[in-house]
């Protein structure tokens, strides 16, 4: 009898070891596809990113980073219901995940669900375990901007830049706020700081053109306009310039 029991134990242990090894192989494969998906996402190759992130989840359905990355990809593709679904999956898998709280809070504010988004981000901003508080505070600033509370937005964004003076999204938002407040020199200063850490976008160029025009810097206006038309010819900002040009 004891030999039979021992044999059963050995079989159970062997099966458990096989399952553990198989699961490890799946998890390792999931991590590889997650890294590939994130890389393709950063390069703007959304089709390849989607394929790899979905494979990562197929290999390991509990991969929180893969679900968060896929949610962000769906946002880029304007598939907001699919993005919400991914965020809600992560909420069930790991409700205390700080990256989830930050991204989901931002997502909710972008969808104009301000009460839910601000509540989630404010909770995170009081969490001492948050290793990137400037991102959280910037997202709070963006929420407040969406709500029309420019004063609170500026307060949060200023705090974010005190925590990380090189954080590009906060610099970009402060450039826009300064321009809207007719504080053109400050807008230009924030742009120059932004350009030290991030590339130009059609939006930054558009604000730069308006800012330099307000400051009377005609040479800079021509340079920024030319850069916009050459590098982003199909952007809405370039179309606006072309439509307003007397030589169109």
Residue ranges and their predicted role:
Residues 196-248:
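Terminal, low-structured helical/coil segments at or just beyond the last alpha-helical repeat
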Residues 25, 59, 93-94, 127-129, ...:
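Structural marker of alpha-solenoid helical repeat scaffolds
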Residues 42-43, 76-77, 110-111, 127, ...:
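Register position in tetratricopeptide repeats
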């Amino acid at each position: 009898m004891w030999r039979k029991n021992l044999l059963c134990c050995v079989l159970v242990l062997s099966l458990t070891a096989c399952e553990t090894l198989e699961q490890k192989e799946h998890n390792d494969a999931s991590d590889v596809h997650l890294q590939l998906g994130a890389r393709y996402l950063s390069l703007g190759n959304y089709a390849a990113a989607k394929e790899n992130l979905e494979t990562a989840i197929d290999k390991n359905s509990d991969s929180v980073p893969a679900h968060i990355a896929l949610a962000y990809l769906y946002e880029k593709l304007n598939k907001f219901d699919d993005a919400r679904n991914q965020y809600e999956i992560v909420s069930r898998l790991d409700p205390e995940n700080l990256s989830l709280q930050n991204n989901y809070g931002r997502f909710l504010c972008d969808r104009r669900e301000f009460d839910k988004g601000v509540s989630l981000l404010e909770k995170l901003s009081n969490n001492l375990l948050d290793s990137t508080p400037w991102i959280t505070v910037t997202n709070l600033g963006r929420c407040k901007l969406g709500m029309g509370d420019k004063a609170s937005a500026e307060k949060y964004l200023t705090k974010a830049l005190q925590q990380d003076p090189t954080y590009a999204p906060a610099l970009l938002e402060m450039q826009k706020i300064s321009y809207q407040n007719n504080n053109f020199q400050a807008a230009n200063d924030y742009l120059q700081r932004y350009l030290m850490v991030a590339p130009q976008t059609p939006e930054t160029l558009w604000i730069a053109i308006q800012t330099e025009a307000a400051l009377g810097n005609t040479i800079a206006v021509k340079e920024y306009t030319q850069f916009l038309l050459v590098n982003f010819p199909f952007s809405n900002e370039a179309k606006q310039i072309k439509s307003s040009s007397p030589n169109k």
